UniProtKB/Swiss-Prot annotation:
<protein>
    <recommendedName>
        <fullName>Pesticidal crystal protein Cry12Aa</fullName>
    </recommendedName>
</protein>
<dbReference type="Pfam" id="PF17997">
    <property type="entry name" value="Cry1Ac_D5"/>
</dbReference>
<dbReference type="InterPro" id="IPR005638">
    <property type="entry name" value="Pest_crys_dom-III"/>
</dbReference>
<dbReference type="InterPro" id="IPR008979">
    <property type="entry name" value="Galactose-bd-like_sf"/>
</dbReference>
<keyword id="KW-0749">Sporulation</keyword>
<dbReference type="InterPro" id="IPR041587">
    <property type="entry name" value="Cry_V"/>
</dbReference>
<dbReference type="GO" id="GO:0001907">
    <property type="term" value="P:symbiont-mediated killing of host cell"/>
</dbReference>
<dbReference type="InterPro" id="IPR038979">
    <property type="entry name" value="Pest_crys"/>
</dbReference>
<keyword id="KW-0800">Toxin</keyword>
<dbReference type="GO" id="GO:0030435">
    <property type="term" value="P:sporulation resulting in formation of a cellular spore"/>
</dbReference>
<dbReference type="InterPro" id="IPR036716">
    <property type="entry name" value="Pest_crys_N_sf"/>
</dbReference>
<keyword id="KW-0843">Virulence</keyword>
<comment type="similarity">
    <text>Belongs to the delta endotoxin family.</text>
</comment>
<dbReference type="Pfam" id="PF03945">
    <property type="entry name" value="Endotoxin_N"/>
</dbReference>
<dbReference type="GO" id="GO:0090729">
    <property type="term" value="F:toxin activity"/>
</dbReference>
<comment type="function">
    <text>Endotoxin with nematicidal activity.</text>
</comment>
<dbReference type="InterPro" id="IPR005639">
    <property type="entry name" value="Pest_crys_dom_I"/>
</dbReference>
Length: 1257
């Protein structure tokens, strides 16, 4: 028997027992990423196509990812160059997905044509069953045979044969690929053609990438490089021509034609155009490493109208004439409302979509459709409750309902988020009132998509809606990668105070995004984020028929002139009629953090900007001194009172060039020209003696291998004499061939300084207790100083000091209540899905964690200190070190989040390690907004009063990123005992504890009232109330359907009921929004118990699919009988009249003539069920069901005369709706009689949420 204490433990804020594994990883994006990582791991090792097919098969067969998205995933990793020594064929890999059977694998595997056939037929409204017959079979067989020969040769490392077959295959594909778009199937064959074109382009990539192994000469490689460009061009033109020909069929602007057109564009985008957009990236001449191109293209739903048929619009006035563009990320939906003078009808009058598109400044903007506009009559305006949207929890489906009383009234909108939660808005008339009927329209995003915005026509009240979708995989933040080439659509940027962003007059279908038509004098602003310091080449993909000019600026660096040539047709000609090309702007060192670049068009000649690409070089994590060049052309004044010419705690440089003049001791001005290369001494100082006269100093001609960098230029004079100067030009450079010098301490005073610091770590000479003011971070700083002592000069002393600092580190670990504060041990940490452990950072001796921007998943670390580790009436210190943090929130909670602070810690580099008693990190610096930044080291305190061992509040510690562009690198985290509380402090903490305890007990009372009745209902399902045992013999589907859980962990379908209870269980943890919390654990256990009961019910039922969870599978249908979903969400078999029926034949194993059986049916209307049995079906049992509502009826137990029974359901008079039907064995102890349950049930509409009965087992 499950008890309340068992399912609802007393412990405060507990996580579920499996919380480490219970991340929200069930969504498409998580599964897709998981699959990509598996692909990348195998591909890097030189895996064959069949190996990747095995990986994909798991996701395909479970239905987690559809075959088309699997192929897109494969294509995304084929640009990755495998490890040295392996030859992996990208062409044969993709072919193994198109035609898996030609390799003899997976005998039940469908080829991609079979998978896409239903979708293609729906798009083009043409039966393509005979498509394969229309393909030239002789040429097709020749193609497959050559593919097989090439693949076998590659697999066997027979490169001579592989080269021959590659050339043969290229020849066949060049001449015969048109067989896949035969006459009559020019559009229908397009998805197949695109798949084979993938293989052709990748085949040429194989020839270039594997040229040395395959034996191609340099001349042959040059030919292949030209040919791959021509092939991409030709295949792209063939696809776009056929696509546009198909699009021409939808020229009418009425609603019906628009819906067909929208569906055609949607399907072709997913099946064809997304592939075409990748083809240019297959050219290794420009894409030498793995490539990730983001898509911002949109697809739209059909126009849907939640109104009666006689009020639906069909005219062209509501059809949008503009192309739907990506707007940014949707963060809020609002609906304006109006009420008539009588106060009887209140409806939505418009939609406001609010978007987030300016990450660094956290700006939002909105797009309105008919928002708060007056269409007719006297209205009072208002606004419904807004629906806020978390950036990493987008909307994936919508449901709009209008309720009617002579006119549109009582509108409501319900949305489903990615994690299964819901949001809603409604327009409720002030007086309430009865409504005739509700009209509901629902729409869901295609797999892998999210809602970008909702469009409504401007002409009338909200009768006409279109959902515009974009890819879930398109992140809010433009995050650079040190491993991949990243391409970002230009439309992810914005134009500020220079008019609106304009697009070309025609849509561009082949880029995965809409290019920006940058007008003369307009500046595109593009913001991005880097998690690591690295060098990148920045380039643009553009189109310009006459060449053009412009300017480029990265952050606050100098303006750079751009002379952009005419784009040639080396790759593709877009639908806009211009050719796309690449233009390299330059190479730059980009430090970790947020950045902005600007591209200004400064010419009357046109320029279309498609995307901005970042090509990474090696990471500069090991040489963080490198930084962007700086140029200062403005005048810099210095004198005795202000001697600093330039300084930076963020950047340092190897080469400095100064021009100007100076005056000292009353002399006349003299010219000053100084050209310095970096010094070699560890303190980075270099002195230039300037005499009374013109100075031209040239120190060093080149960088030296062991040189260090400047980070400060100061003018001084040995005496107290006056001096002043003017710098008219200053240039600061880096030469990128220096290295970091590890200091070596060899002087006796340095040993003395370090020894003093080691001794100061301890509270006494016994050295068994740390000093109270010593942090874990400072211990590691002292360790680094000890390590820098010279072995040759101080070998003995160094060994003794190292023993002491090791002891200090052990004591630090013992006193730290956090487990793994340096992340040497992760067992106690809860981490966001994308948080990673890293090492080798100049500001940390130990490991640290990187909290990246929360692009797709929350970014956090969390740990709880149990109550048993604490002492009563004690103050505890919480401390840690943040190397770099932007929008990182520290939360420490016992009685209610006592510490909650968002910190901004700027990116800074380590200062040279010295023997002095200072850290290698810098002092607090100014942020971009000139406000004082937070220090790298934080320290706070929290007070603990009396211990609550039963409730176990403990101390909860967490760091998380709270803005989309935030990030952090942290380590040396501690919670340690400080001191006993004073009497006054004890009284203060007692008051806080009393308030906390009162709220805690109230919450438990409320939760208990909610879950106890459900607990009792579930206990009643099972024999001996054992949830792991068997359900009772009299349990029916009806019993399960009447059990209402307070909320749902996940929901897969739209449920237009929005009458939520006043109190909702907190499914997720209060801090970690992607992990199941204590209430979620309760619901999960309830759902598991119901799932087990449902499974047992299914196994008892002799009828297959008696609950119609898989439509009408296993049933033979006649007439108009069909599966349908009712307005309340109920799935039923509908027999509309007496001419429709459904039949199923069942066969009983281990048949017993004496075994009794019973029929139970839950239905509405008048119908009959007959069961025919015997050798010739001569025996008939009949049961009649006649009710005006959904009610369960059952017959008297009976026996069968044979093991085969035919069950026949028919309507007797009008509509007959069957919710479920069962035929079960009757226990020999059962004494049930024929009864009708007269309590109608509602299986979907409820005050809480319906039990999530599985729809597929």
């Amino acid at each position: 028997m499950a008890t309340l204490n068992e399912v609802y433990p007393v412990n405060y804020n507990v996580l579920s027992s499996d919380a480490f594994q219970q991340l929200d990883t069930t969504g498409f994006k998580s599964k897709y990423d998981e699959m990509i990582k598996a692909f990348e791991k195998k591909w890097k090792k030189g895996a064959k196509g069949k190996d990747l097919l095995d990986v994909a098969w798991t996701y395909i067969t479970t239905g987690e990812i559809d075959p088309l998205n699997v192929i897109k995933g494969v294509l995304s990793v084929l640009t990755l160059i495998p490890e040295v020594g392996t030859v992996a064929s990208a062409a044969s890999t993709i072919v193994s997905f198109i035609w898996p059977k030609i390799f003899g694998d997976k005998p039940n595997a469908k080829n991609i044509f079979e998978e896409l056939k239903p979708q293609i037929e729906a798009l083009i409204q043409q039966d393509i069953t005979n498509y394969q017959d229309a393909i030239n079979q002789k040429k097709f067989d020749s193609l497959q045979k050559t593919i097989n020969l090439y693949t076998v040769a590659i697999d066997n490392n027979d490169y001579v044969t592989a080269k021959t077959q590659l050339e043969n295959l290229n020849s066949i594909l060049t001449s015969d690929i048109s067989i896949f778009i035969p006459e009559g199937y020019e559009t229908g064959g397009l998805p197949y053609y695109a798949m084979v074109a993938n293989a052709h382009i990748l085949l040429l990539r194989d020839a270039i990438v594997n040229a040395e192994k395959l034996g191609f000469s340099d001349k042959e490689v040059d030919t292949h490089k030209k040919y791959i460009k021509m092939t991409i061009h030709n295949h792209t033109e063939a696809v776009i021509k056929a696509f546009l020909n198909g699009l021409d069929k939808f020229k009418s602007l009425d609603v019906n034609s628009y819906n067909k057109k929208a569906n055609y564009i949607k399907g072709m985008t997913e099946m064809v155009l997304d592939l075409v957009a990748l083809w240019p990236t297959f050219d290794p001449d420009h894409y030498q490493k793995e490539v990730e191109i983001e898509f911002t293209r949109t697809i739209s739903s059909p126009i849907y109208q939640p109104v009666p048929k006689n009020m639906q619009n069909t005219s062209s006035s509501i059809v949008p004439s503009d192309l739907f563009h990506y707007q940014g990320d949707l963060v809020k939906l609002e609906f304006s409302t109006r009420t008539d003078n009588d106060g009887l009808a209140k409806i939505f009058t418009g939609i406001r979509n609010t978007f987030y598109k300016s990450p660094n400044t956290h700006e939002t903007y909105h797009v309105d459709f008919s928002y708060n506009t007056q269409s007719s009559g006297n209205i009072s305006r208002g606004s419904s409750n807004p629906i806020p949207i978390d950036l990493n929890n987008p909307i994936i489906s919508t449901c709009i309902r209008n309720s009617f009383y002579k006119a549109i009234a009582g509108s409501s909108v319900l949305v489903n988020f990615k994690d299964g939660t819901q949001g809603y808005a409604f327009a409720q008339a002030p007086t309430g009132g009865a409504w005739d009927h509700s009209f509901i329209e629902s729409d869901g995003a295609p797999e892998g998509h999210k809602l970008n915005y909702i469009y409504t026509s401007p002409g009338d009240t909200l009768r006409d809606f279109i959902n515009v979708y974009t890819l879930i995989s398109t992140p809010t933040i433009n995050e650079l990668s040190t491993e991949k080439i990243k391409g970002f659509p230009a439309e992810k940027g914005y134009i500020k105070n220079q008019g609106i962003m304009k697009y070309y007059g025609k849509p561009e279908y082949i880029n995965g995004a809409q290019p920006v038509n940058l007008e003369n004098q307009q500046t595109l602003i593009f913001e991005f984020h880097a998690s690591k310091t690295a060098q990148y080449t920045i380039r643009i993909r553009y189109a310009s028929t006459q060449g053009t000019k412009g300017y480029f600026r990265l952050d606050n660096q100098e303006l750079q002139t751009l002379n952009i040539p005419t784009s040639h047709n080396g790759y593709v000609t877009g639908n806009i009629g211009e050719n796309y090309d690449l233009y390299t702007i330059g190479s730059y060192t980009i430090t970790e953090g947020n950045h902005t670049l600007q591209i200004q068009h400064n010419d009357k000649n046109g320029m279309v900007l498609d995307r901005i690409e970042f090509v990474p070089k090696d990471s500069l994590q090991d040489s963080p001194q490198d930084s962007p060049p700086e140029v200062h052309e403005s005048t810099i004044i210095f004198d005795k009172s202000s001697p600093t010419i330039w300084s930076s705690n963020k950047h340092s440089y190897s080469h400095i060039h100064l021009e100007g003049s100076y005056t000292s001791q009353g002399s006349y001005p003299h010219n000053l020209l100084i050209n310095l290369f970096h010094p070699t001494d560890p303190n980075r100082n270099h002195t230039i003696h300037v005499n009374n006269g013109d100075m031209n100093v040239d120190y060093g001609k080149d960088s030296v291998a062991d040189g260090l960098n400047f980070n400060k230029i100061t003018a001084t004079i040995p005496s107290d004499a006056w001096y002043s100067g003017t710098i008219t030009s200053m240039h600061l450079f880096n030469d990128n061939n220096f290295k970091t010098i590890t200091p070596k301490f060899e002087l006796s005073n340095e040993l003395e300084n370090i020894t003093t610091q080691v001794n100061a770590l301890f509270a006494s000479s016994a050295q068994d207790t740390l000093a109270s003011n010593v942090s874990d971070y400072w211990i590691e700083q002292v360790v680094m100083k000890v390590d820098a002592l010279s072995d040759e000069v101080f070998g003995k002393e160094k060994k003794a000091l190292r023993k002491l600092v090791n002891q200090a580190k052990r004591l630090s670990k013992i006193r730290n209540l956090l487990i793994g504060g340096n992340f040497d041990n992760l067992v106690a940490w809860y981490m966001g899905k994308d948080v990673v452990k890293e090492s080798d950072h100049e500001l940390f001796k130990s490991d640290h964690v990187l909290l990246p921007p929360p692009t797709f998943h929350p970014s956090y670390i969390f740990q709880k200190v149990e109550e048993s580790k604490l002492k009563p009436n004690t103050r505890y210190t919480i401390s840690g070190f943040i190397a770099h943090g932007e929008d990182v929130e520290l939360v420490v909670s016992r009685y209610g989040q006592e510490i909650q602070k968002v910190m901004q810690v700027p990116y800074e580099e380590a200062l040279p390690l010295t023997s002095e008693s200072n850290s290698s990190c810098c002092v607090p610096n100014l942020n971009i907004n000139e406000t004082l930044a937070d220090p790298h080291f934080f320290s706070y305190s929290i007070d603990v009063g009396s211990l609550e061992m039963e409730a176990n509040p403990g101390i909860e510690f967490g760091l998380r990123i709270v803005k989309p562009t935030g990030m952090a690198r942290v380590s040396n985290l501690e919670i340690r005992e400080d001191r006993p509380l004073t009497a006054k402090e004890i009284r203060q903490v007692q008051r806080a504890a009393r308030d906390w305890k009162q709220n805690y007990e109230q919450e438990r009372t409320e939760i208990t009232a909610i879950i106890q009745p459900v607990l009792n209902q579930i206990n009643a399902l099972y024999e001996n109330e054992d949830w792991n045992g068997s359900i009772r013999s009299n349990v029916s589907y009806h019993d399960l359907e009447q059990i209402m859980l307070p909320t749902l962990l996940k929901t897969e379908e739209i449920n237009c009921n929005y009458d939520h209870p006043a109190f909702l269980l907190k499914v997720y943890h209060w801090f970690m929004t992607d992990r199941i919390g204590e209430h979620g654990t309760i619901l999960a256990r309830f759902q598991e118990a119901l799932d087990r009961a449902y499974t047992q019910l299914e196994s008892r039922n002799l009828l297959h699919n008696g609950h119609f969870t898989t439509d009408t599978a296993n049933w033979t249908i006649e007439g108009d009988a069909h599966h349908t979903i009712l307005e309340d969400g109920r799935r039923v078999l509908r027999l509309p009249d007496w001419s429709s029926n459904a039949t199923q034949t069942i066969e009983i194993e281990d048949f017993d003539l004496d075994q009794e059986y019973q029929l139970l049916i839950h239905a509405k209307g008048k119908g009959s069920i007959t069961l025919q049995h015997g050798e010739e079906n001569e025996y008939v049992e009949t049961h009649t069901h006649h009710t005006n509502d959904f009610i369960t009826s059952q017959n008297i137990p009976f026996t069968f005369k044979g093991n085969q029974i035919e069950v026949h359901i028919t309507s007797e008079d009008g509509e007959f709706l069957i919710d479920h039907i069962t035929v079960i064995e009757v226990s020999k102890t059962d004494t049930n009689t024929n009864i009708i349950e007269n309590s109608p049930i509602n299986t979907s509409m409820n005050s809480n949420v319906r039990v999530d009965i599985p729809r597929s087992l």
